Structure formats: structure tokens, C-alpha cells
């Protein structure tokens, strides 16, 4: 098993972190239940003390036409998947033109934008070398019900790439901040929006040391420059406490915190 050092202050989308050892997994028999897969670290906040970090190597970066379905390796990135579906006139993953991440993370969190999400197109996934049908994965709103590493997944083939869906997703992205961030900080509570709640307690544009909630959209935690893990964690806890006190609602993080 190969090992490398990754500086997460450069590698992660929020640009917060320290240099840490990361295992590079190239074969199924190297996978362990203890591994914390980092992918491209787009929706992660990684502690300086985080252990068992790993990423899938180049052997998992592929897209293969299987006839009735498309099989995609866990390390294939969203841009590559989007371009394949568009070039082959396939529908269902148009939103990946506006989302970062690797296939493994996209399946694990049932990634999506509004009503467009991974589970709408997914057929099955190989978790720790065991194939599971979609129904067994427990996919919900930005969540899943399985533990383990997504090594590969299969998607149904339906012809007819939808440019209209892509344009709708592009329009949604216009409100996203330009500063380093990890996408939505919190999941939307049932019948409400995290951004509305955060704005309601005065956190839109609010800064705490070197982190803050974006002026463009309150549900985006941004790195104002040189921020550290504890600063981001403090702001997340502050936001949860304020929303709970004001609205009686427990906000749940969409960002994954690895310790």
C-alpha cells in the first residue's frame, strides 16, 4: 500500500488543514472499514489529528460502458463523469457539471442540486467489494445508510442529455461565494432552508476570526485567509447554538468532519 503526504490547506476546497499522511489504495484487498476516504476533499473539514485517511488510486479512476448500464470507478471525478454523460447523450447527471467531488463521495452523500440527485440514476454500488442494489444503500437527502468505501457504481443508461437541467443548475451556482468553502455547511431541515435560519440569527456575512458565513449565501462557511480547523469548528457550533435557541431547530452538518 502506497502512502503520501497531503497538505490540506492546499488540497481541500475550503483550504483548511495541515499536512497529513494519506494511504493510496489501488486494490480491493487493501480496503479497510477504518479508512476515511478523502476523495478530492470538497465537502470535508479535516482535523490536524485525523487518522486512517485514504484515497482511491488510479485503478479506480475509470468509466466503462457495460451495455445496459455504465460502471464508474470510485475515484472518477464529477467533471469526467459529466463530460462522459454529455458526450454520450445520457440523462440524469447533468447537475455534475456544477458539483465537485469523486464518484465515491457523490454516492456516499447522495449528492445533488434540488430535486436532481445521484439516487435518481444509480442502480447499484460496490461497497467494500460487495455489490448492493440501490434500495439497500439507504440513500436519502444528502445522506446514505451504509458504512464502508464506495469502490465502483453502476448507473442506468437513458438517452437524452438535458441542457435545460444543466442551465438550471448553473443558475443555482450563481449565488455561491468565490472564497474557499466546502459547499453547503448544513443540511436543510424538513420544510425549511438552513440559509434562511442562519440569516435569521444574523449570521449572513458574519465573521469569527479567519472564517465566516458568506455574504452571498448564509449557508456557506468561507475561509477568509489562513483559517484553521478549530476556527471553523467554533463557527459551526456557534451557528447551531444560535439556530437552536431562536428556532428550536437542530441543524445537521452537511460538511463531513474527519477527526
Swiss-Prot record:
The reactions it catalyses are: UDP-N-acetyl-alpha-D-muramate + NADP(+) = UDP-N-acetyl-3-O-(1-carboxyvinyl)-alpha-D-glucosamine + NADPH + H(+)
Q: In which pathway does it act?
A: Cell wall biogenesis; peptidoglycan biosynthesis
What EC number(s) are associated with this protein in UniProt?
1.3.1.98
Q: Where does the signal sequence lie?
A: none
Q: Looking at the keywords, is Manganese present? A: no
Q: Any idea which UniProt keywords this protein has?
A: Cell cycle, Cell division, Cell shape, Cell wall biogenesis/degradation, Cytoplasm, FAD, Flavoprotein, NADP, Oxidoreductase, Peptidoglycan synthesis
Active-site positions on this chain: 142, 184, 254
Q: Which SUPFAM superfamilies match?
A: FAD-binding/transporter-associated domain-like, Uridine diphospho-N-Acetylenolpyruvylglucosamine reductase, MurB, C-terminal domain
What top-tier enzyme class does this entry carry?
A: oxidoreductase
Q: Name one GO cellular component term.
A: cytosol
Q: Hey, which family's this protein in?
A: Belongs to the MurB family.
Q: What is this protein called?
A: UDP-N-acetylenolpyruvoylglucosamine reductase
Protein's organism:
Helicobacter pylori (strain ATCC 700392 / 26695)
Amino acid at each position: 500500500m502506497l502512502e503520501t503526504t497531503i497538505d490540506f490547506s492546499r488540497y481541500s476546497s475550503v483550504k483548511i488543514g495541515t499536512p497529513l499522511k494519506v494511504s493510496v489504495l489501488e486494490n480491493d484487498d487493501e480496503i479497510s472499514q477504518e479508512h476515511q476516504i478523502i476523495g478530492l476533499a470538497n465537502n470535508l473539514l479535516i482535523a490536524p489529528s485525523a487518522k486512517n485517511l485514504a484515497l482511491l488510486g488510479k485503478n479506480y479512476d475509470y468509466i466503462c460502458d457495460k451495455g445496459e448500464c455504465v460502471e464508474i470507478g470510485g475515484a472518477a471525478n464529477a467533471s469526467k463523469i459529466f463530460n462522459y454523460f454529455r458526450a454520450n447523450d445520457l440523462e440524469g447527471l447533468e447537475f455534475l457539471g456544477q458539483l465537485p467531488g469523486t464518484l465515491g463521495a457523490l454516492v456516499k452523500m447522495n449528492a445533488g442540486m434540488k430535486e436532481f440527485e445521484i439516487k435518481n440514476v444509480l442502480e447499484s454500488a460496490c461497497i467494500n467489494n460487495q455489490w448492493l442494489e440501490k434500495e439497500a444503500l439507504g440513500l436519502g437527502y444528502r445522506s446514505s445508510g451504509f458504512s464502508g468505501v464506495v469502490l465502483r457504481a453502476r448507473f442506468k443508461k437513458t438517452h437524452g442529455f438535458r441542457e435545460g437541467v444543466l442551465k438550471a443548475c448553473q443558475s443555482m451556482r450563481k449565488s455561491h461565494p468565490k472564497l474557499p468553502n466546502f459547499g453547503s455547511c448544513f443540511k436543510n431541515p424538513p420544510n425549511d432552508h438552513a440559509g434562511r435560519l442562519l440569516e435569521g440569527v444574523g449570521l449572513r456575512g458574519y465573521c469569527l476570526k479567519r472564517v465566516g458565513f458568506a455574504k452571498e449565501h448564509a449557508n456557506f462557511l468561507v475561509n477568509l485567509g489562513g483559517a484553521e480547523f478549530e476556527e471553523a469548528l467554533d463557527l459551526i457550533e456557534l451557528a447551531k447554538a444560535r439556530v437552536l435557541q431562536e428556532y428550536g431547530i437542530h441543524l445537521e452538518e452537511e460538511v463531513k468532519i474527519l477527526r
